[in-house]
């Protein structure tokens, strides 16, 4: 007996097969609607079974099958149907009315679950030992013209089974099931290999297709049976009734309604001896890197596991049809590796590409090619492809490549050349590829491993040290290690120099050479986009980084070793060899390395190449310039002269770089010299010319520092260079990788000042400056300079003529500096430890700080009842020095000099402003006072300051707070809020808590006891005050304009002593402040010029003697003699109105020498009386 695919037994004369009880699952993936008008499937089923019942169930063997556990299950078509009934056909046949019996010819074995609504393209037909009473299958029958069919629920029940068994269908022995017209229905032919069929369906289910490639799964589509290989209408064969019909297979996932893809139609049948459950593990081929930085071109494992021909064929197929996701790509190539032969013609890509020929010989239309990506140079399962991008071999328009068989017409034979290129590891240039618009280099893994010694194995980001180390000694053919467009597009043959132009949009052929040579072309001749792209992205790092501008210790050491090889000191020893360094050169190398390390601690070595011409002669390893240029200069300049025949030609590049350095041309070849850091000064002073550096914000901060010579490097680098007699290029030597916004403010500010000076500067005069004073000129000048190299004998002979001009310029600069220092010192803002302060102190004597002011006077013993004398016993100027106390502060603070007279009469308690309890010397107190004097002028006069006593220690936590200790006197300036005062202590102003101090009741004005007046010699006249005069001391008489004064005596030529009638006020006042209206004849004759010491000392010395002992060296007899003569050594300009002006060689009669270093005397030249610094005069 035999069984058909439906599981029903029938008699066959051909063979006898033993039945085995195996559960069988089959499905029909392509069930499509065949027509609009058909009868009800229920009636069709009944009519068919009435005609030929043994076709459905088998005639004589039904009982035997039932006994073995197989039941005949017929669908019970319920009356609940859609209004539109569609006739069901199998396999998309679009013929006339076809009987649906062939669809229902197999009994159902229901599954344990219901089908999802989304997977309703077919009904799974299954045998089972136990059947449920009823189960619904929802089938959407679709018509050919795209209209939606009806959902037909299928029910099975025992009642319907009994009704169906009596129906018979027409039977044609030997032909198989037929429709009403007698045409055999479609019978599956692959039942002998069920696993292969289910595997194909499983792959179609789990494949993610391109959006829009297929229509909605519910839309009607027509696929003729001739285009499928799974089903075809034919008569019964041996495979229909084979024993494989009952082979047990696992229950599959219900397949979706997916039309067969064009690639699947051409799949060949797998061999019977293949493993039945063989699955392709794609993880080893598709192990994607975790990040893009781990990706290494050429290291994909697919290159080691698959054949290049298969790679190429599948890549061509993929290049013409790009799937939209990595999942579909993975599925496509997984099937192709299993089903397609290794070598074969390309399959047609559906109806769209069926007319195309194999692109192996297809003509590529040159630069007007419509292919986006032409040739795939790697496996489809490479990591980059798994991420959705194609690493493809780019032909025009951006870059051209020709292999061994490349032709200018651009035929696709270069694909074959590329395959041959993969097999030539030694003599091949890296293929230039593009990924998403950026270049990447991909090459076979075998080539990378075989050429690792001579070719750089990777193209990736490299450090500066690695880029600098890849030199001609290490690599005979160095490669550009850069990601930039310019460097990858511009790879050239490094063994012979040729003019480089930008990549031509046409494929070029280089005869006699297996490598394509990409040539540069001027940006102005290239298309507009390429020109713009060049200006944006052209940073050829081979030109930039393979220079001898070395910036690290490692690079310096390698450079030093290379120079030793050039000199022949190492006798063939190379830095790349494993041999030890010769023993005799070790000490020299160590000392040299120490120097290099010391140099590397400072800024990068500017190098001699900064002032040397550009090396236009190509070196041995190709185009390797000797210096680094700015990006702007590389972008703006045209193609430089790079051919050896053009190298000797004099040229001068006027680039558009805003910052340039012009170097003169007459230069003698210099022998290589090593300058240590100590030689810098000598080298710097060898040059006699300066040139201003024009710049803009493009200049980096390091360039500015280079200009201002702040580096500790010698001006000449330690690299060996070849100099040529021609004009130099103007270039910005820049070690900055980009713009430095941080340096913009400082640099542009200096540039404004520089350009303003530059417009008014005399160039010939500047060129004649003496080099001997160049260091001082650099110190003095605030403008950065760049030296010109002038080593010609003509310039050296002119050095002797420029000393006078340099001296004049320096004298003017020093004068400005002195004026500035003096102004700063007068304001008190010049620190004592500043270099300018020390410089001036060497030129002029230090003016002593005055303790003979009013505040010092109030610290004298006459104020001891209220203000005790400091413990250091500081002595003060005698009271008769009326000029000493006129101003309260020393000469170091001229901004507070003329403002304290207006409150001189109210100094009773206000003069206790200074903290007398402080043990510090009064000089420091005056210094602190000077810092707060400006605040006093701003509206807080000392009479408004309220004294307060600190009841607790307070330590300032911030700079705004004021520290003091318990018992200190603090002067309150104002009240900040309810908790804080602003006050003054020791000359410092700050805030402190209110609760930390206790206000003091202001005492009565503390006026010293006035000495009894001497015997009056008689009135000498009367005078009227012309101006207001405020007394600074208690011996002076304050005047108001218009006051009438009785003149008692003439103290000296500058002072009168008098009194105001009607009051007890008496004192001295300046002669110039009053106008004499009445003069007694006797008094005028008796005292035409009264002796100053006698009359002056009678009042003042009495005051001194009544308070403290008289100083040694100052006696009454000395005063009687008119003073001790001194001669002025320097000019002194008064800074306060009580000071005496001195001119050099003036003779001054000194009346008193104060302990603070100031003298009191009268100038014989001007007849003025005042104070002056004691170190400005010498004894005669």
UniProtKB/Swiss-Prot annotation:
Residues 367-384 have a biased composition (Low complexity). InterPro entries: Endophilin_SH3RF, SH3-like_dom_sf, SH3_domain, SoHo_dom, Znf_C2H2_type. SUPFAM superfamilies: SH3-domain (SSF50044). The modification Phosphothreonine is found at residues 357, 372. Gene3D superfamilies: SH3 Domains (2.30.30.40). Keywords: Cell junction, Cell membrane, Cell projection, Cytoplasm, Cytoskeleton, Membrane, Phosphoprotein, Repeat, SH3 domain, Ubl conjugation. The modification Phosphoserine is found at residues 27-28, 40, 130, 143, 239, 319, 325, 328, 339, 367, 377-379, 381-382, 384, 463, 574, 577, 630, 633, 829, 923, 1097. Residues 943-1002, 1018-1079, 1121-1180 form the SH3 domain. It is found in: Cytoplasm, Perinuclear region; Cytoplasm, Myofibril, Sarcomere, Z line; Apical cell membrane; Cell junction, Focal adhesion. Residues 237-247, 261-285, 933-945 have a biased composition (Basic and acidic residues). Ubiquitinated by CBL. GO terms for cellular component: apical plasma membrane; cytoskeleton; focal adhesion; lamellipodium; perinuclear region of cytoplasm; plasma membrane; synapse; Z disc. One of its GO terms (biological process) is regulation of skeletal muscle acetylcholine-gated channel clustering. Residues 25-60, 73-96, 216-285, 314-392, 911-945 are annotated as: Disordered. One of its GO terms (molecular function) is protein domain specific binding. Residues 83-92, 216-232, 314-328 have a biased composition (Polar residues). Residues 166-230 form the SoHo domain. The first 2 SH3 domains are required for WASF1-binding. All 3 SH3 domains can bind independently to PTPN12. Adapter protein that plays a role in the assembling of signaling complexes, being a link between ABL kinases and actin cytoskeleton. Can form complex with ABL1 and CBL, thus promoting ubiquitination and degradation of ABL1. May play a role in the regulation of pancreatic cell adhesion, possibly by acting on WASF1 phosphorylation, enhancing phosphorylation by ABL1, as well as dephosphorylation by PTPN12. Interacts with ABL, CBL, DNM1, DNM2, FLOT1, AFDN, PTK2B/PYK2, SAPAP, SPTAN1, SYNJ1, SYNJ2, VCL/vinculin, WASF, ABL1/c-Abl, ABL2/v-Abl/Arg, ACTN, CBL and PALLD. Interacts with PTPN12 and WASF1 via its SH3 domains; this interaction may mediate the partial PTPN12 and WASF1 translocation to focal adhesion sites. This is Sorbin and SH3 domain-containing protein 2.
């Amino acid at each position: 007996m035999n069984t058909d695919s439906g599981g029903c037994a029938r008699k066959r004369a051909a063979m006898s097969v033993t039945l085995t009880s195996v559960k069988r699952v089959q499905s029909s993936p392509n069930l499509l609607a065949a027509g609009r008008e058909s009868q009800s499937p229920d009636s069709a089923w009944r009519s068919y079974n009435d005609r030929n019942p043994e076709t459905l169930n088998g005639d004589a063997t039904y009982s035997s099958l039932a006994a073995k556990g197989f039941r005949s299950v017929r669908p019970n078509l319920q009356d609940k149907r859609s209004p539109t009934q569609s006739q069901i056909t199998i396999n998309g046949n679009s013929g006339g009315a076809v009987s649906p019996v062939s669809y229902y010819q197999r009994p159902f074995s229901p599954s344990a679950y219901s089908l999802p609504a989304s997977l309703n393209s077919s009904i799974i037909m299954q045998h089972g030992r136990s059947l449920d009473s009823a189960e619904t299958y929802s089938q959407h029958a679709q018509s050919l013209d795209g209209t939606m069919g009806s959902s037909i629920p299928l029910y099975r029940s025992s009642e319907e089974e009994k009704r169906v068994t009596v129906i018979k269908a027409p039977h044609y022995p030997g032909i198989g099931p037929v429709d009403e017209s007698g045409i055999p229905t479609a019978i599956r032919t692959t039942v002998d290999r069920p696993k292969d069929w289910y595997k194909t369906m499983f792959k179609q289910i789990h494949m993610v297709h391109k959006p829009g490639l297929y229509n909605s799964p519910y839309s009607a589509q027509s696929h003729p049976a001739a285009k499928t290989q799974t089903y075809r209408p034919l008569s019964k064969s041996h495979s229909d009734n084979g024993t494989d019909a009952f082979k047990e297979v696992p229950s599959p996932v219900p397949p979706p309604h997916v039309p067969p893809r064009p690639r699947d139609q051409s799949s060949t049948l797998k061999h019977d001896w293949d493993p039945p459950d063989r699955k392709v593990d794609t993880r080893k081929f598709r192990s994607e890197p975790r990040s893009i930085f781990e990706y290494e071109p050429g290291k994909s494992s697919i290159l080691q596991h698959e054949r290049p021909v298969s790679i190429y064929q599948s890549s061509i197929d993929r290049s013409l049809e790009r799937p939209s996701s990595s999942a579909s790509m993975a599925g496509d190539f997984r099937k192709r590796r299993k089903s397609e032969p290794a070598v074969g013609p390309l399959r047609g890509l559906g109806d769209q590409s069926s007319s195309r020929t194999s692109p192996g010989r297809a003509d590529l239309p040159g630069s007007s090619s419509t292919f986006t990506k032409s040739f795939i140079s790697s496996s489809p399962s490479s990591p980059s492809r798994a991420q959705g991008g194609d690493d493809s071999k780019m032909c025009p328009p951006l870059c051209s490549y020709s292999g061994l068989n490349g032709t200018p017409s651009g035929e696709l034979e270069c694909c074959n050349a590329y395959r041959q290129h993969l097999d030539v590891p030694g003599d091949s240039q890296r293929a230039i590829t593009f990924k998403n618009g950026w270049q990447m280099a991909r090459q076979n893994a075998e080539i990378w491993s075989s050429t690792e010694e001579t070719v750089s194995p990777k193209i990736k980001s490299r450090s500066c040290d690695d880029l600098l180390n890849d030199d001609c000694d290490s690599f005979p053919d160095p490669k550009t290690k850069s990601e930039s467009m310019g460097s990858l597009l511009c790879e050239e043959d490094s063994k012979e120099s040729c003019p480089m132009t930008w990549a031509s949009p046409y494929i070029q052929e280089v005869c006699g050479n297996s490598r394509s040579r990409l040539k540069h072309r001027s940006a102005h001749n290239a298309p507009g986009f390429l020109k713009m792209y060049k200006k944006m992205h052209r940073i050829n790092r081979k030109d930039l980084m393979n220079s001898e501008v070395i910036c690290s210790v490692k690079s310096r050491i390698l450079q030093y070793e290379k120079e030793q090889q050039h000199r022949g000191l190492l006798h063939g020893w190379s830095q790349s060899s494993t041999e030890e360094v010769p023993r005799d050169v070790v000490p020299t190398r160590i000392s040299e390395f120490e120097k290099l390390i010391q140099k590397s601690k400072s800024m990068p070595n500017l190098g001699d190449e900064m002032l040397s011409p550009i090396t236009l002669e190509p070196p041995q390893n190709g185009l390797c310039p000797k210096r680094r240029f700015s990006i702007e200069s590389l972008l703006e300049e045209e193609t430089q002269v790079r051919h050896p025949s053009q190298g000797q030609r004099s040229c001068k590049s006027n680039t558009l770089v805003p910052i340039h350095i012009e170097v003169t041309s007459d230069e003698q070849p210099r022998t290589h010299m090593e300058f240590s850091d100590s030689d810098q000064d000598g080298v710097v002073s060898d040059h006699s010319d300066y040139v201003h550096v024009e710049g803009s914000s493009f200049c980096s901060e390091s360039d500015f520092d280079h200009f201002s010579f702040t580096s500790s490097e010698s001006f000449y680098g330690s690299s060996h260079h070849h100099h040529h007699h021609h004009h130099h290029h103007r270039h910005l030597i820049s070690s900055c990788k980009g713009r430095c916004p941080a340096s913009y403010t400082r640099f542009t500010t200096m540039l404004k000042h520089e350009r303003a000076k530059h417009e008014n500067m005399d160039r010939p005069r500047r060129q004649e400056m003496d080099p001997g004073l160049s260091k001082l000129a650099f110190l003095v000048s605030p403008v950065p300079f760049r030296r010109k190299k002038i080593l010609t004998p003509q310039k050296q002979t002119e050095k002797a003529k420029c000393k006078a001009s340099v001296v004049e310029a320096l004298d003017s600069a020093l004068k400005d500096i002195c004026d500035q220092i003096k102004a700063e010192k007068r304001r008190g803002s010049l620190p004592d430890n500043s270099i300018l302060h020390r410089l001036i102190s060497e030129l002029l004597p230090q003016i002593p700080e005055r303790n003979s002011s009013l505040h010092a006077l109030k610290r004298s013993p006459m104020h001891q009842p209220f203000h005790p004398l400091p413990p250091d016993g500081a002595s003060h100027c005698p009271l008769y020095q009326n000029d000493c106390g006129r101003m309260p502060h020393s000469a170091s603070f001229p901004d507070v000099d003329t403002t304290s007279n207006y409150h001189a009469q109210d100094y009773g308690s206000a003069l206790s402003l200074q903290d007398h309890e402080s043990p510090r010397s009064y000089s420091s107190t005056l210094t602190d006072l000077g810092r707060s004097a400006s605040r006093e002028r701003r509206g807080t006069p000392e009479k408004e300051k309220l004294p307060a006593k600190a009841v607790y220690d307070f330590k300032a936590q911030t700079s705004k707070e004021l520290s003091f200790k318990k018992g200190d006197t603090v002067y309150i300036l104002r009240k900040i809020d309810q908790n804080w005062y602003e006050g003054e202590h020791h000359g410092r102003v700050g805030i402190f808590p209110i609760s930390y101090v206790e206000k003091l009741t202001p005492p009565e004005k503390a006026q010293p006891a006035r000495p009894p007046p001497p015997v009056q010699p008689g009135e000498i006249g009367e005078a009227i005050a012309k101006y207001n005069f405020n007394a600074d001391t208690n011996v002076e008489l304050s005047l108001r304009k218009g006051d009438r004064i009785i003149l008692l005596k003439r103290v000296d030529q500058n002072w009168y002593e008098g009194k105001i009638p009607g009051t007890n006020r008496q004192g001295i006042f300046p002669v110039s402040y009053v106008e004499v209206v009445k003069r007694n004849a006797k008094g005028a004759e008796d005292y035409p010029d009264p002796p100053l010491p006698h009359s002056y000392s009678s009042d003042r010395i009495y005051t001194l003697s009544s308070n403290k002992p008289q100083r040694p060296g100052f006696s009454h007899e000395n005063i009687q003699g008119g003073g001790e003569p001194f001669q002025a050594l320097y000019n002194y300009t008064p800074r306060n109105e009580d000071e005496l002006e001195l001119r050099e060689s003036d003779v001054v009669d000194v009346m008193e020498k104060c302990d603070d270093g100031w003298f009191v005397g009268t100038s014989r030249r001007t007849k003025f009386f005042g104070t002056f610094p004691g170190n400005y005069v010498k004894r005669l």
